[in-house]
Structures are given as C-alpha cells and as structure tokens.
C-alpha cells in the first residue's frame, strides 16, 4: 500500500469515528436539555409529576421541531472539529502567515461557537416563563421588547465566545492518550460527571462579567432593538439594581452558561475519546491469498506525515506493542521473511523510526540556531590562553564577556589586535565597491525605517524560538517512538533469535543521544524563551528514559557497540548517574 493510499485509508477510519462523535454530540443535547428542565421545573412535593412532566416535555413534538436549528449548528460544529483534527499542521513563521492560514478557520469556528450558544439559549428560553420565552411580549396592552430574553440570548453567545477564546483561539486541537486503559463506557461516564461538575464552577466568571457589561450597555441595546422592531421599551432591567436584584434571571443565566460550557467541552472530548482509540495496524501483512489488501502496516501509519493524529496513533500503537512481553505481535518484529530469510519487518520499522528521529533532530537543531542566547554562546570567541592567566581568572573573563555580549554592553577601549591581519597573496588591498556600500547602507536604513512602523515587526518578524516551540508542541510521536524503540531493543536480548536488532543498535543509540544533547542545550535557556515547559519536559524525560533503558540493557557491550570517545563516556556516565 502506497503512502497516499495509507493516508486515505486512515482518514476514512477516522472519518467514521468523527461521524460517531457527531451523533454523540447530537444525543447529548437532549440529555443536557433534560437536566436543564429538571432544574427549572423542580417540584419538591410532587417528585413523580416533576420527572414525568420533564420527560414529556423532552419527548414532545415541539422539542423535536424546535431543536432542529440547534442540531444543525452542532453538526456544523462537529464538521469543523473533524476538519481541524484531520488537517495538516503547518508551521507559520510569522503572525501574518498564521493569520492567512488559520485566520479563516478560526473565524468560522468562532461563528460556530456563537451559533451554538445563541441557538441553545433560544431553545432553552422556550421552556421558561412567558416573560422569558420571546423577544417581544405584551406589557400594558402593547408590544414591548423583553429585556429578560435579550439578557439570556446574549449570555448564550457570550458563553460560546468565552469557550472559544479560552480553549481554541491560540491553541491547536490535540488528543490525549489515557495513562490507565478504560472502556469507552467508563470514559463517557467519567467525562459526563466531571464536565457537569466543572461547568458549575467555570461558568461563574463569564456570568458575572456578562452581567456587569449588561448593566452598563443592556439598556442601550434594548433601546436600539425596540426602535428596530417598532415596539416599546422594557424598563424592568433599568439600572444596576434592576439586574442584580432579579435572582431568577441570574439563576437562569448561570444555569444556561453552565449548560453551554459543558456542552462544548463534551463535544470536544467526544472527538478526543474516539480518535484516541487504537487503529487496526499490523506489523507484517499476511501473504495468504485471502488476506485483506486494506490492512495498514505500522510503518505506513508512521509515514503519514500530513495527518498528525494518524502519526500519533501509530506511534502510540508501537509503544503499546513494545510493552507487551512475550506477545506474538511483538515477536513479528524479529521474524525473518519466508522465502528470503530477511528481517524485512524490523528493517522497514527501524529505517522509518530513524528517519523520523533524524529529521526531527535536524529541524530542532536548525531552529535552536536562531535563538539569540544559544547563538551568542556558540559564536563566543575563546580568549587566548597565556601563562600569566590562572584558571579562575580565565573563567571570570569568559563569564564577563558572555554577560556583556548578552546585554549589548560594548567595551570602552577597542580590543587590541594580537594577531596580524593577513595580507592578500598579490599584496594589494581590495576595497569594496562604493555602489555596493551605498546599496548596503540604503537597505539597512530602509529596514530600520520599516521596523519603526507600529505592527510591522509584530506581524512580519518571526518570534524568537517559534519554530522550536512548534516542534516541541508536535513531538508526541517522537515521545512514543523513542520509548518503543528502547523497549524493543531491551527485549531483543531474549526475544530476538536471529540478532536482527543488534546490527542497528549503534545507529539507534547515536540518534537518541544526539537528540538528548540538543535537548540538554535547550534546557539551559528554557526560561528565557516562550516554550511550553510541559511538552519539553515530557520529550526530554522520554528521551533520557529511553537512552537509559538501552544503555542499562547493553551496559556490558557499550565498548563493542560504540567507538571510544566522548559519546561513549557520556553514555557510561548516564548509567552510573542513574
């Protein structure tokens, strides 16, 4: 199966899961509506009538027809979530490129949040008292604008906007793999209880903030709507005390905000639960005539670079497979092909993993070279060692020079030139052309002028450490892959009868150790740049743990696997330190 066909097959599998997530999102709307009606129509003295009346309302024809707009908005919300999960993650070096690539998608997603919040509030207000149900109501024999309805519709849109800003505006959608394996029913039950309980607390801030804003601008909005609809003004919520003293309205707004926040959180987590389930990947394809041609191999899943979720699932599957002791699936990695007696399974898997590790390390190294602190440390010239300088004085001068270069402090006296400038071979000093000097000065002046324009640097300059942050945020496949390789290498001592892994041990150790050295360099400046410390710590600990597992298993053979030098000494020190 080619790379494109593997990608399409994986996308088709994930698309089916996204469809099930949409159906779950639609079903949860009626469950949340039932919970809302149970709160609103609470009757302590008549519990049976309270429950039966609520269920009768949910099952009525009015509910089914009135919920059609909300269901349509939920489907739109789910389609956008599916598109974000299955799309390629591109690096945008500047904020302008980010706006071009992600801006339209974010605006559409914000519109979906506002639409779901508005339609949820519109549907729920239809079950409240007459003053809350419609935008217009009869007051003193005339049509008046309902300030209560305006308040609830506005708080629905505010809740949707609040969830988008706090969760989706600057962050990309990602899935999390559970540490403890649970069934889907157990995950759904825990998610439902936790979401409903958490939403009651998280809805306090948006409710209070919206109420404060409505006290200031609510009468103006109601006055404007009354002119548009040609109705009279509603004066029930005039002033601060008119809003604050209406306890029932505040309770409805708080409950509605909690319902909307829990609804959006549940829809997002449904995708995370279903998409984090294992893909049906195989180590080797069966060669029988009746074998399925659509079987996706583990190597093909790791090679799907344009869908981040697929690569994460393949790496996680490889990690779980490597942890299964004495399993037939893990034994397939060490098997030879028939006919031919070649380690085709291990060869393709090892080459794919080393290719991913090598490309990730190279990109990380290139991105770290753009960080000014690391660049200054690498380009710092070493002072000329003389006999009169002691070791402590040398160290003090190096630290002083690093400090001055970091903060841009120049020496008062220009340094003396101890080394004579080498003259050209022909003895003639060549000066640069005056046209070249003028053009260079004009270019530098133009750059300085453009940088003074407000917003130019912010939009069109690449932030320091942005590429490094992007790589670390998308390093989950590398985290699982390094640990899986370490487990397979450690298990090969007992389970590899043909020794197919031992030939590639030096390359695996060097690749992981190279990544470890780069992460150690980055750890020295992690506090000075905007890098997610959680993703960095996860990657660094996984790499160190993987390298330690391999070195501990082959500690007696490190001298045979690696040539003598600095790398061998580092690995021996790692085993001794741990």
UniProtKB/Swiss-Prot annotation:
Pfam families: Ndc1_Nup. Its main location: nucleus. Belongs to the NDC1 family. The gene is Ndc1. One of its GO terms (molecular function) is protein-macromolecule adaptor activity. This is Nucleoporin Ndc1. Residues 43-60, 128-144, 222-239 are perinuclear space. It comes from the Eukaryota. It is a multi-pass membrane protein. GO terms for biological process: mRNA transport; nuclear pore complex assembly; nuclear pore organization; protein transport. Keywords: Membrane, mRNA transport, Nuclear pore complex, Nucleus, Phosphoprotein, Protein transport, Translocation, Transmembrane, Transmembrane helix, Transport. The keyword Thylakoid does not apply. PANTHER family: NUCLEOPORIN NDC1 (PTHR13269:SF6). The chain crosses the membrane at residues 22-42, 61-81, 107-127, 145-165, 201-221, 240-260. Component of the nuclear pore complex (NPC), which plays a key role in de novo assembly and insertion of NPC in the nuclear envelope. Residues 1-21, 82-106, 166-200, 261-578 are cytoplasmic. It is found in: Nucleus, Nuclear pore complex; Nucleus membrane. The modification Phosphoserine is found at residue 414. GO terms for cellular component: endomembrane system; nuclear membrane; nuclear pore; nuclear pore transmembrane ring.
């Amino acid at each position: 199966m080619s790379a494109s066909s593997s990608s399409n097959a994986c996308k088709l599998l994930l698309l089916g899961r996204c469809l099930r997530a949409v159906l779950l999102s639609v079903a949860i709307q009626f469950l949340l509506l039932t919970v809302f009606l149970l709160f609103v129509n609470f009757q302590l003295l008549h519990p049976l009538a309270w429950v039966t009346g609520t269920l009768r309302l949910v099952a009525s024809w009015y509910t089914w027809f009135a919920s059609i707009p909300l269901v349509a908005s939920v489907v739109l919300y789910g389609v956008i979530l599916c598109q974000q999960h299955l799309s390629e993650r591109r690096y945008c070096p500047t904020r302008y490129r980010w706006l071009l690539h992600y801006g339209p998608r974010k605006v559409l997603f914000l519109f979906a949040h506002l639409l779901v919040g508005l339609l949820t509030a519109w549907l729920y207000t239809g079950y409240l008292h007459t003053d809350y149900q419609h935008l217009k109501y009869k007051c003193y024999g005339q049509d008046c604008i309902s300030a209560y309805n305006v308040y609830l519709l506005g708080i629905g849109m505010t809740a949707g906007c609040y969830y988008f800003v706090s969760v989706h505006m600057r962050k990309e959608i990602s899935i999390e793999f559970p540490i403890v394996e649970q069934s889907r029913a157990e995950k759904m039950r825990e998610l439902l209880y936790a979401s409903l309980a958490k939403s009651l607390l998280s809805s306090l801030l948006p409710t209070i903030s919206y109420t404060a804003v409505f006290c200031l601008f609510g009468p103006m909005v109601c006055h404007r709507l009354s002119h548009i609809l040609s109705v009279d003004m509603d004066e029930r919520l005039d002033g601060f005390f008119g809003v604050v003293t209406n306890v029932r309205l505040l309770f409805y707004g708080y409950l509605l905000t909690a319902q909307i926040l829990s609804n959006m959180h549940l829809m997002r987590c449904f995708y995370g639960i279903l998409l984090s389930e294992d893909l049906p990947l195989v180590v080797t394809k069966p060669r029988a005539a009746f074998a399925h041609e659509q079987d996706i191999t583990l190597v093909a899943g790791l090679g799907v670079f344009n869908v981040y979720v697929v690569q994460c699932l393949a790496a996680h599957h490889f990690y779980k497979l490597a942890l299964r002791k004495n399993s037939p699936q893990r034994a397939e990695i060490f098997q030879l092909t028939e006919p031919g007696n070649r380690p085709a399974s291990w060869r393709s898997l090892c080459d794919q993993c080393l290719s991913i590790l090598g490309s990730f390390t190279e990109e990380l190294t290139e991105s770290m070279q753009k960080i000014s602190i690391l660049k200054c440390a690498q380009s710092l010239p070493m002072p000329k060692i003389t006999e009169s300088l002691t070791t402590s004085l040398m160290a003090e001068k190096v630290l002083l020079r690093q400090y001055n270069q970091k903060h841009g402090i120049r020496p008062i006296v220009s340094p003396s030139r101890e080394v004579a400038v080498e003259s050209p071979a022909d003895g003639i000093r060549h000066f640069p052309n005056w046209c070249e000097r003028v053009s260079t000065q004009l270019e530098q002046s133009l750059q300085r002028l453009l940088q003074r324009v407000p917003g130019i640097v912010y939009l069109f300059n690449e932030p320091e450490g942005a590429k490094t942050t992007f790589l670390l945020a998308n390093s989950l496949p590398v985290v699982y892959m390094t640990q899986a390789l370490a487990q397979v290498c450690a298990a090969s001592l007992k389970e590899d009868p043909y020794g197919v892994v031992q030939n590639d041990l030096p390359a695996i150790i060097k690749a992981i150790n190279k990544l470890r050295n780069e992460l150690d360099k980055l750890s020295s400046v992690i506090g000075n740049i905007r890098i997610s410390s959680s993703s960095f710590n996860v990657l660094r600990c996984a790499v160190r743990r993987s390298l330690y597992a391999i070195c501990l298993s082959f500690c007696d053979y490190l001298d045979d696997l690696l040539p003598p030098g600095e790398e061998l000494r580092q690995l021996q020190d790692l085993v001794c330190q741990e």
